[in-house]
Amino acid sequence: MPNDLTPPALLVEGLTKSYGPRRALDNVSLTVGRGEFVALLGPNGAGKSTLFQLLSGLFGADAGRIVVAGHDLKANPTAALARFGIVFQQATLDLELTVQANLLFHAGLHGMPSALARARAAEMLEQFNLSARAKEPARALSGGTRRRLELARALMHEPTILLMDEATVGLDPASRLELLRIVREMREKRGVAVLWATHLCEEVAEADRVIVLHQGHVMKDCTPDDLITDTGKATLMEAFVSLTTERASVPA
């Protein structure tokens, strides 16, 4: 169990990133505790995808630091990235490989011994109700089932924190709710922390905390209930809109 001396699953301090004259992230700081479910809520263009690209090491930040379970991403990228399980907005499965082979390929990238990889794959297939489809190509799966496979793959190496980057985009309402339910269940069963990026208020109501991102700035970091109370609004949607309209002032 985490204690006061255990470093958080994720620590972001002063993260800044610009593309030419446009500043996509401006001095962003946030923390995700061990086993915590934190929703990153922001409209399109808020900087959510840029943040996830920096977290996953696809690009470097102009300033600031990222520490994953005590490992500085810049100083020790291998150890830091190994603590992440990531489901990107765009599907990243190899559609020609079988369901099982997608899991085993991921295990190989993380240096898992063959016997352990096969045991973990069998466990994930069972847990995500994919055992009967293990030998089918990923191409044969529906959108919702592909997302389940991507989540199973992200958990293969037992990460400290899951990064879910708009993972429900393109899913029907039933599949979207099912994916959210599974992620919450994995958090409860495995103690994995979650950073869930979304623009949909209905996906954040049960989060431990909500971080509202707008124009590259953190506008609010609090519980869903406090977000409503602090803005003086009646619903999460109204609170979100009040913080992310063009009239909303970003922090100086």
Model features per residue range: what roles?
Residues L162-D165:
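Catalytic Walker B motif of ABC-type/P-loop ATPase nucleotide-binding domains
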Residues P137-L141:
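Conserved ABC ATPase signature
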Residues E158:
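Conserved catalytic motifs of ABC-family nucleotide-binding domains
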Residues L104, G108, A115-R133:
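Conserved ABC ATPase "signature" region
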Residues G64-A75, A80:
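Conserved ABC transporter NBD signature motif
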Residues L177-K189:
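Helical segment within the ABC ATPase nucleotide-binding domain
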